[in-house]
């Protein structure tokens, strides 16, 4: 569970910009709300190689153990962060 939360936070730290793949938010939505097969297909689109594909599927299995409300809220939070004008600024936490 700690690993899943850590990976989620790392993914959320990527801000939406011209350097960020437009499909990133869609892949996140499949991770949190899609079926395993839908998420797997989204990963395969990017040709990650078998080790990365397997790691992504392990992450999906961990994420699927979270309550649905938590997963929905993580997607909403991701959308807010990735589409925020603040993403263009250097965060000083």
Curated annotation (Swiss-Prot):
GO biological process: signal transduction
Pfam families per the UniProt record, alphabetical: Uteroglobin
GO terms under cellular component: cytoplasm; extracellular space
Keyword Secreted: yes
Localization, UniProt: Secreted
Classification via InterPro entries: Secretoglobin, Secretoglobin_1C-like, Secretoglobin_sf, Uteroglobin
Gene3D superfamilies: Secretoglobin
Main localization, broad class: secreted
UniProt signal peptide: 1-17
Keywords: Disulfide bond, Phospholipase A2 inhibitor, Secreted, Signal
Family under the similarity heading: Belongs to the secretoglobin family.
Quaternary structure annotation from Swiss-Prot or TrEMBL: Antiparallel homodimer; disulfide-linked. Interaction with LMBR1L is controversial.
PANTHER family, A to Z: SECRETOGLOBIN FAMILY 1 MEMBER, UTEROGLOBIN
Record function comment: Binds phosphatidylcholine, phosphatidylinositol, polychlorinated biphenyls (PCB) and weakly progesterone, potent inhibitor of phospholipase A2.
Protein name: Uteroglobin
Organism: Neotomodon alstoni (Mexican volcano mouse)
